[in-house]
A protein has these predicted regions:
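Generic protein-terminus/edge-of-domain signal
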Residues: 1-68
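Short strand-coil-strand connectors
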Residues: 61-65, 79, 88
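Conserved metal-binding segment of the jelly-roll/cupin
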Residues: 69-82
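Ligand-binding loop in jelly-roll beta-barrel domains
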Residues: 80-102
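Conserved segment of winged-helix/HTH DNA-binding domains
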Residues: 98-113
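Short, Lys/Arg-enriched, Trp-marked, Pro/Gly-tolerant hinge/linker segments that flank
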Residues: 111-119, 134-144, 154-194
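Amphipathic, well-ordered alpha-helical segments in soluble domains
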Residues: 122-126, 148, 155
Length: 195
């Protein structure tokens, strides 16, 4: 897995990311990381993201709202949404990114009423199993990973209250992305006041 962070100057050597783009080693479309004390900055990417708390707690900022994530709680971030994670000391989080096309028939039509939910669906166990599947790379592992995340997303969406998917970003999110794009284009001459 290759992570590319594009900073406000357009270089890929800093962590001031506005947009994350990753290239996978093979044809897999799912990735799972396990992190202790994770901190990242506000960013977005074209994959959906599922964050699950195994230990401790974390603040997850998602678009215009901050959620407190406790053990056995999860947050679902729709593709394209601006989000960040600030974990407390000794926290353990699983973070799963998956291609938005895998579950498009579900996630393009519906979204949970609230992105924060209790893990009544085996999210933590499934993400752990997915990590092993992706690391072992047995025959057909890509298809198996797609199937595992699809089954998990369907379970969550069947069990949580749903609403129609909103594909229009909030004004704050749109302005934030526009500001970062402007900073990209005018990095050398843009002043804090003008921004």
């Amino acid at each position: 897995l290759l992570w590319t962070f594009i900073d406000i100057a357009g270089r890929s050597d800093k962590m001031l990311a506005k947009f994350e783009k990753r290239a996978y080693a093979g044809s897999e479309r799912v990735w799972v990381g396990k992190y202790r004390n994770l901190h990242n900055i506000a960013h977005w990417h074209m994959e959906h993201e599922l964050i699950a708390c195994a230990e401790g707690s974390a603040k997850v900022m998602l678009d215009d709202t901050t959620y407190r994530l406790a053990p056995n709680q999860c947050v679902f971030c729709q593709s394209g949404s601006v989000h960040s994670i600030e974990a407390d000391p000794d926290s353990l989080l699983y973070v799963c990114l998956f291609n938005e096309n895998i579950c498009a028939s579900v996630t393009q039509v519906y979204q949970p009423v609230t992105p924060l939910f209790l893990d009544r669906y085996g999210v933590l166990q499934t993400l752990s199993d997915l990590r092993h599947e992706l690391s072992d790379r047995q025959l057909f592992f890509e298809t198996k990973a797609d199937a595992m995340i699809t089954e998990l997303v369907i379970s969550v969406f069947r069990g949580e209250p749903l609403t129609a998917a909103v594909h229009q970003t909030s004004e704050v999110t749109t302005r934030y992305k526009q500001l970062l794009n402007r900073m990209d284009a005018e990095y050398d001459s843009l002043t804090f006041q003008n921004a």
